């Protein structure tokens, strides 16, 4: 994993890794999901510009609507190649949300969440750096 340079994102990903190493119960695994969810929101906030990235459904994205912000960003930045990447990013949001609310959360679930959030962070940073 290459740090994104987004301090809050990098700090949160590191925190997720540290917590995963020591987590030993459902509540601790759920907390990793919560950090993952917040990290995805932060990533979306780093790149989303409502003036440049109109939402696909015309509904204004709230400051915490990671799915809508990422979808709008990716649709503009990747154009016709965006469909599968949007699906991937939205799936990462779903995984983090699911883990946050899963009262039977496991270490495997938390690990999958960490991997997906890390992948989205790297993906979005790469898109931002490479431009069109």
Give the location of each predicted region.
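Charged alpha-helical initiation segments
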Residues: 1-29, 132
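Residue-identity detector for glutamine
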Residues: 2, 30, 45-46, 98, ...
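Amphipathic, well-ordered alpha-helical segments in soluble domains
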Residues: 8-15, 35, 42, 88-95, ...
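Arginine residue identity/basic-tract feature
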Residues: 8-11, 19, 37, 68, ...
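Short hydrophobic alpha-helical module
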Residues: 19-23, 38, 42-53
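Generic macromolecular interface patches on structured domains
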Residues: 26, 49-50, 106, 127
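Short acidic alpha-helical/loop segments enriched in Asp/Glu that coordinate divalent cations
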Residues: 27-33, 45-63
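Long, charged low-complexity segments
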Residues: 58-131
